[in-house]
Amino acid sequence: MNRIAFVFTHGPHGDAAGREGLDALLATSALAEDIGVFFIADGVLLLLEQQQPAQILARDFVATFGVLSLYDVDSLYLCAESAAERGLDADAGWVLNAEWLSAADWRQRLSAYDTVMTF
């Protein structure tokens, strides 16, 4: 079975990449067993709690990341450098528990996947 990675690089608002990636991830989880989810650059912002998308007339899809464990998606990785560059740390309040990795470890973990889909 192929190992499939989903890489989130865009923030939660401004374009539909995060929402579309999450939809694709949930659909793929019904067909694949070995899925990894990676957050880097502005993609780390997808995991922040307390977002208020209604104020910009956007849909609140970020909380849906919290149900990934119900879909047996447990391999979650966040680039620690990306979070630090945005002034975030482990205490920032996250919608799910992702493993914090250095950029080098993040890339190494990603390289173990056969297919990479970037959103």
Swiss-Prot record:
Q: Chief localization class?
A: cytoplasm
- Output the SUPFAM superfamilies linked to this UniProt entry: DsrEFH-like
Listed GO cellular component terms? Answer: cytoplasm
The record's annotation in Pfam families points to: DsrE
Gene Ontology biological process terms in this record: tRNA processing
Q: Which InterPro entries match?
A: DsrEFH-like, Sulphur_relay_DsrE/F-like, Sulphur_relay_TusC, Sulphur_relay_TusC/DsrF
Does the record carry tRNA processing as a key word? yes
Keywords linked to the UniProt accession: Cytoplasm, tRNA processing
Gene3D superfamilies per the UniProt record, alphabetical: DsrEFH-like
- Where is this protein localized, as stated in its record? Cytoplasm
Keyword Cytoplasm appears in the UniProt entry: yes
Which family is annotated? Belongs to the DsrF/TusC family.
What's the subunit arrangement here?
Answer: Heterohexamer, formed by a dimer of trimers. The hexameric TusBCD complex contains 2 copies each of TusB, TusC and TusD. The TusBCD complex interacts with TusE.
The UniProt entry, under NCBIfam families, shows: PRK00211.1 (NF001238), sulf_tusC_dsrF (TIGR03010)
Q: What does this protein do?
A: Part of a sulfur-relay system required for 2-thiolation of 5-methylaminomethyl-2-thiouridine (mnm(5)s(2)U) at tRNA wobble positions.
* Identification of the protein by name: Protein TusC
Which organism does this record belong to?
Answer: Sodalis glossinidius (strain morsitans)
What taxonomic ancestry is recorded? Answer: Bacteria, Pseudomonadati, Pseudomonadota, Gammaproteobacteria, Enterobacterales
